[in-house]
Amino acid sequence: MELSEIKRNIDKYNQDLTQIRGSLDLENKETNIQEYEEMMAEPNFWDNQTKAQDIIDKNNALKAIVNGYKTLQAEVDDMDATWDLLQEEFDGEMKEDLEQEVINFKAKVDEYELQLLLDGPHDANNAILELHPGAGGTESQDWANMLFRMYQRYCEKKGFKVKTVDYLPGDEAGIKSVTLLIKGHNAYGYLKAEKGVHRLVRISPFDSSGRRHTSFASCDVIPDFNNDEIEIEINPDDITVDTFRASGAGGQHINKTESAIRITHHPSGIVVNNQNERSQIKNREAAMKMLKSKLYQLKLEEQAREMAEIRGEQKEIGWGSQIRSYVFHPYSMVKDHRTNEETGKVDAVMDGDIGPFIESYLRQTMSHD
């Protein structure tokens, strides 16, 4: 890349950031941050823990936007200063470093713009992600477990914290189901792109004849709603609460008493399990919160369905069908059927590199809104 081209790219980035700044209202956001931090410094701040956590989350979200912009602008200013130095005295190694910075910077701007677009009413929330294997016994249970690992690795790379709240191992290998609580800013905003059916094609390690098998697993994702977001009353007569002994994933704490909780909500048919906490009381509280989140999501989807009917739209809400195929044999390819995004780097995808699929889907849905 010639120096003149490097300069054109730097100038373009400066223009992009100026345009982004115009839509951000940074001064107002910084004022809000100051107000939130004054609230957080008050001695009675933690009297209402739910309200306190809400303020902390809002403050962190604003700081992510403001600091994200300032970091990008500082990087562009540094690149500009380096270019000026190269004009005064050329240095081949410095030029190579600057060229690489210019190339890498585009991805950083794209990622930041995507964060700004995640402005849905619940995008900033934590996420509850569930995996269930399709028919096919051990083969599909192993596939669900592979997806479980894929999402764990993706979340690690994004800086999200993952808590396994329910885990049911498969008969021979894999899992029959798993429920994850994923904590982090915009966790739901990103992971909502994964809701649907995932298809695997491979030579089965469980088939002595070495035949090719197709397996399916479903992924469901809902926001983890804060208590003050949910206007749901649950009639005690509508639920059954059962206790059972926690099974636990490998290496996790396994209770010797029946501290795990299963709540069945009969009107909706929703069943939630929680075995992450060490006490039955805490597991029950966590399970009730999860049940409320599921019922509230159900209510929101019903409202969205009604609005779609009013507008005459045929937009499917809910699980939908197959969203992505992972082909290990006879060739290597992962393809998203909603966006046609694809890659031959199957191992990287299974190691959590699903960002391009998520971002492609989010940009497509945002452009259609």
From Swiss-Prot:
Subcellular location: Cytoplasm
PTM sites of type N5-methylglutamine: Q252
GO biological process, one term: viral translational frameshifting
Post-translational modification: Methylated by PrmC. Methylation increases the termination efficiency of RF2.
Location (main, coarse): cytoplasm
Signal peptide: none
SUPFAM superfamilies, sorted: Release factor
Membrane spanning stretches: none
InterPro entries to which the protein is assigned, alphabetical: PCRF, Pep_chain_release_fac_I, Pep_chain_release_fac_I_sf, PrfB
GO molecular function: translation release factor activity, codon specific
Record-level GO cellular component terms: cytoplasm
Keywords: Cytoplasm, Methylation, Protein biosynthesis
One Pfam family recorded for the sequence: RF-1
Miscellaneous note of the record: The gene for this protein contains a UGA in-frame termination codon after Leu-24; a naturally occurring frameshift enables complete translation of RF-2. This provides a mechanism for the protein to regulate its own production.
Record's function text: Peptide chain release factor 2 directs the termination of translation in response to the peptide chain termination codons UGA and UAA.
Family membership noted in the UniProt record: Belongs to the prokaryotic/mitochondrial release factor family.
Protein name (Swiss-Prot/TrEMBL): Peptide chain release factor 2
Gene, per the UniProt record: prfB
